[in-house]
Swiss-Prot record:
Gene3D superfamilies: 3.40.630.30, Acetylglutamate kinase-like. It comes from the Bacteria. HAMAP family: N_acetyl_glu_synth. This is Amino-acid acetyltransferase. Belongs to the acetyltransferase family. ArgA subfamily. One of its GO terms (biological process) is L-arginine biosynthetic process. In bacteria which possess the bifunctional enzyme ornithine acetyltransferase/N-acetylglutamate synthase (ArgJ), ArgA fulfills an anaplerotic role. The keyword Cytoplasm applies. Pathway: Amino-acid biosynthesis; L-arginine biosynthesis; N(2)-acetyl-L-ornithine from L-glutamate: step 1/4. The gene is argA. It comes from Shewanella oneidensis (strain ATCC 700550 / JCM 31522 / CIP 106686 / LMG 19005 / NCIMB 14063 / MR-1). Keywords: Acyltransferase, Amino-acid biosynthesis, Arginine biosynthesis, Cytoplasm, Transferase. GO terms for molecular function: L-glutamate N-acetyltransferase activity. Pfam families: AA_kinase (PF00696), Acetyltransf_1 (PF00583). It catalyses: L-glutamate + acetyl-CoA = N-acetyl-L-glutamate + CoA + H(+).
Amino acid sequence: MRCKQRVRTTELVDGFRHSAPYVNAHRGKTFVVMLGGEALAQNQFRGILNDVALLHSLGIKVVLVYGARPQIDAALAANGIEPAYHDGVRITDEDSLKVIKQVAGALQFDITARLSMSLSNTPMQGAQINLVSGNFVIAQPLGVDNGVDFCLSGKVRRIDAQGLKRQLDNHCIVLMGPIAASVTGESFNLTAEEIATQVAIKLKADKMIGFSSQNGILDRNGDVIAELMPNDAQKILNKLAEQGSACIGTMAFLKASIDACRNGVPRCHLVSYLDDGALLQELFSREGIGTQIVTESAERLRRASISDIGGILNLIRPLEEQGILVRRSREQLEIEIEQFMLIERDGLVIGCAALYPFEEDNAGEFACLVVHPDYRDADRGSLLLKNIIGQARSRGYSRLFALTTRSIHWFLEHGFVIEDVDALPQKKKQLYNYQRRSKILALDL
């Protein structure tokens, strides 16, 4: 008998546990995944397709739209045909369309073959995926623009949403390429971004997902912007267009995301095709890894309720154990819960603060300010303070005070000044703990 030594690791267990809420949340939802030609040209595209298969196995309805921009350019050049563009849109003549059909067909076979694999010791073992393609998109010609004839370049005329839904309900992955037919029986070359956008809109998809060479949209410091509203995304798109330095695929998907969000798709995600597992990390972790363009923020600031007590206790308990916060019992929190504001992200309480009234002194106490350690990079504490200040002013308070042992400079940076114990309201002064020796700070409102 041979015994195998087993190494115990908590990473896999922790990963499963942390992803479980997202597995449950995504089950039965519809995702439109757009793989541009740039992504398909990378070795990592096999891993991406494995991850798409995993989404399918978790009960997610997947429409996979692929593009072929670099592959088409290379094939045209190999056939002695100069690629022609106008305003970033390909001009497709009859000779070009023949080549484009060959390229699109080859890519379709490659993707189908990869998603049909079920070898042992591979991520696709036992997958048994049914892949469906068809005439779900009806095209029409782009026509002539400013004297430029786009010939056989087309755009979406309509989407067979009911046909798509039937296939998705039958547990199929729908695969869609850049070639679509018109009502006259002609074939047209469309952009993958437009197909993905229109499919997502017509299906009322829950997400549209795209890939770029970067992990999303970067700010001026080179850091990934986690979340953008459509109007902010439009400003960034305009700036990127002026600079002319951004990847064509990135700009095209950003534009498509803005259009999709403005037409009812709640969230669009942009992740890197170079980062192995980026798709899964974006969808099944609270932090994500790329950029979301959203119609409504994943985070929201709201007043706490009784059901939030467990989340608040989990947030403040580590600081209580370190002696940074005064310990609060569950019973005390139940009594004081209406004084609390919190920041919630995907069901997790990631920040909280309280405003305790001292009406007889026309003052309020700013207390129990806590932000989760993983979310201290976006000035959420200032957001909570701003909200509490607004509440205090609306109640007519003239002063806001706070007690702290560790965050003196943070309060000073936000306009507070150091006071002595005698400056406290009488009731608070009677409860002051001289052993903790908390610093007293106040802000005139």
